[in-house]
From Swiss-Prot:
Protein name: Heme A synthase
Self-association state and partner proteins as the record states: Interacts with CtaB.
Reaction catalysed by this enzyme: Fe(II)-heme o + 2 A + H2O = Fe(II)-heme a + 2 AH2
Keywords noted in UniProt: Cell membrane, Heme biosynthesis, Iron, Membrane, Metal-binding, Oxidoreductase, Transmembrane, Transmembrane helix
Organism of provenance: Azorhizobium caulinodans (strain ATCC 43989 / DSM 5975 / JCM 20966 / LMG 6465 / NBRC 14845 / NCIMB 13405 / ORS 571)
Length: 349
């Protein structure tokens, strides 16, 4: 039952939409901070998962030393950071702590308004169910994050590229879902689009998510630190089959062979660029809002491709790598809005 006397504005779709877009912006920030945490090799600095008490950082020198001593027990310290001092440890600790704190902030930024909007009647029916589903996905993402970190605490000096890719992709799936729900609360556009345009818009979203997963594998394998030329890769447009399929069974190359993983990432980028361009031409013939949306999508895809090339040839500097990661979320948001507006039906609350 809705709260009696709740302000009308609090029950309006516009208020819900602003809330969802704000959470989406926080998720974009989370993806960038997560990228910085990975690139600074800070992700394993906190070796325990304490969802409640872990919100507080060490408050005394004794607390800091205890955290540092726990870090000294994992392979990353023994193999890569032996001899690291406490001050250097604090630097990587703050990155990971900030990443986890932001996750908690996002959880509260979603859950508290969710309760309020549900109690005031702004969320009902299908919209309520969808928002509750988003909350469950957020909880799953927290568990997946720890599952990823745990893979680097016992036998390896870094996290599993499989789990990193899943963690990143799930964050982006949540982002697309939030944007889709928020966009569905806007008035419907009058423009009717051919089925091929609606389908291509959806396919672009799927390809961008697939590319983000491939990018997670590239990051997890540090595959961007090798084959730092473009358009050639190891002197060829297409590397030798023997190199791309060096591992047995062959499927492992798609996930564990740095050359193959990078080649797949490049190939999906070419596919997205070509499809976005052809889709743009199709939408320009139709005109209207679809043409404007498709233009934005293609412009962001082109900018993201350029950022990817620069990141590669400069061997993954922090600023370019983070810009590339941010660019991926912007492409995804633009593609999702375009697909949503091209295909959606109004939610009946």
């Amino acid at each position: 039952m809705a709260l009696a006397g709740a302000p009308v504005a609090a029950r309006s779709p516009r208020a819900v939409q602003v809330w969802l877009y704000a959470v989406a912006a926080l998720i974009v920030l989370m993806v960038v901070v997560g990228g910085a945490t990975r690139l600074t090799e800070s992700g394993l600095s906190i070796t325990e998962w304490k969802p409640i008490t872990g919100a507080l950082p060490p408050l005394s020198e004794a607390d800091w030393q205890a955290e540092f001593d726990r870090y000294k027990t994992i392979p990353q310290y023994e193999i890569l950071n032996k001899g690291m001092g406490l001050e250097a440890f604090k630097t990587i600790y703050w990155w990971e702590w900030g990443h986890r704190l932001l996750g908690r902030v996002i959880g509260l930024a979603f859950f508290l308004p969710f309760l309020y909007f549900a109690l005031t009647g702004a969320l009902r029916g299908t919209l309520l169910a969808r928002c509750f589903g988003l909350f469950l996905l957020g909880g799953l993402q927290g568990a997946v994050g720890w599952w990823m970190v745990a893979s680097g605490l016992t036998e390896h000096t870094s996290v599993s590229q499989y789990r990193l890719a899943v963690h990143l992709t799930l964050a982006c799936i949540i982002l697309t879902a939030i944007v889709a729900v928020a966009r569905s609360l806007s008035p419907l556009a009058a423009q009717a689009l051919p089925a091929r345009v609606r389908l291509t818009a959806r396919v672009l979203v799927g390809l961008v998510l697939l590319q983000i997963f491939a990018g997670g594998l590239v990051a997890g394998l540090d595959a961007g630190m090798s084959f730092n030329t473009w358009p050639l890769m190891d002197g060829h447009l297409v590397p030798a089959a023997g190199q791309l399929g060096a591992m047995q069974p062959l499927w492992r190359n798609l996930f564990e062979n740095a050359m193959t993983v990078q080649f797949v990432h490049r190939s999906i980028a070419y596919l997205i660029f070509a499809l976005a361009f052809l889709h743009l031409l199709d939408c320009l013939r139709l005109g209207g809002t679809a043409a404007r949306r498709a233009t934005l999508v293609f412009a962001l895809v082109a900018a993201q491709a350029m950022l990817g090339i620069l990141t590669l040839v400069h061997m993954v500097p922090l600023d370019l790598a983070l810009a590339h990661q941010l660019g991926a979320t912007l492409v995804l948001i633009a593609a999702m809005i375009h697909a949503s507006d091209s295909n959606r039906r109004q939610i009946v609350a």
